[in-house]
Amino acid sequence: MARWLSQFFIKAMGVAVASAFAMSVSVAQEAKELRVGLLATLSGPAAIFGEHMRDGFMLAVAQSNGALGGLATNVLVVDDKLDPEHAVKQVTKLIDENGVDVLVGVNFSRVMLAVHDPVVRSKTLFIGTNSGPAPIAGGKCNRYFFSTASQDDQVHETMGRYASLKGYQQVVTIAPDYEAARDAVSAFRRHFKGQIARELFPRLGQTDFAEEFNQIAEIEPDAIYAFMPGGMGVELVKQFHTSGLKGIVPFLSSNTINAITLPITSEMGEGLFSASHWAPNLDNPANKRFVREFSRKYKYAPSVYAAQGYDAAKLIHFALELTGGVKEQEALISAISAAPFESVRGDFRFNSNQFPIQDFYLVEGVRRTSRLYEMEAIARVFDDVGDAYAGSCRM
């Protein structure tokens, strides 16, 4: 009996030691590296948006000493060239050849709509850091996709609500003549209770807005709402400044006045309004550290695109600290769902469609010094709000 017990304990100890060794090998192998694919627009006129997003993400990686969640982190940065077909080829390579554990990024909706399905079909965890098209927030939502940005309509809805809160009755809208811009105007109308005096849709690429401003002057609206991204927006702001309307007709906008265009428009963008879920003056410790260290490292002021990239890396970091690795994907998805991190925007949690529930602000272009202009949050317009499409999401 004693001999049998002795042999039993020897065998049990052997199994325990072997199991412990196997577990330690498994953990060691898993902990070796985290592979992240970062897809951004990094060439052409829109490259600055991707650069901000990339730099924000990489700052958070640097703050973790190159090891998100304690895992040595290899970030594979890929330029989507704002080309949906090229982007699909790149994400396929990142998944099939590079074996990335997580994909992050995407600046523009037409790229996001192209890459979303192949990524989630592969069951690769995907964290969007800017684009949030309605289908992905609604009927095509997927448990493998999260967003640290917002749903695309929300900034336009914020300006519509603000216009109503101000009591504006007559608003002229101006946006380029393409589908996404018309969608932006529709989103503005969703929360604006007054009347649209006129919708102006200049052709895409137009740079002379004299006729549009003549029409606005004749109508004498309570406000202008502009959705005019990129170079068109810069020209619109410059010509608004010289039109004689500045200081008379309030200029409300989305994706027109921001941290990227304001250094170009400088005093011409001062005093003009936009909407955002983030601004450099949001008063919380995480944001103060982000703004300070981003400016110090990159020698330029961060934008919302940088903030969204930064939050994505922080989200991954703290989720991995909970799970200890990426091997158990279900555990990692659950950890990310809990949003266990301090966002630069303050209050942050995920909705049922895995897009954020967050605050939205009226932001204004302000002058800090003779050469420094930045966006400043001056009023909260929405408090802890989700998007209009979450109810259509079925996971």
Where are these regions (language model features)?
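Extracellular/periplasmic Venus flytrap/periplasmic-binding protein
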Residues: 89, 134-135, 142-242, 280-289
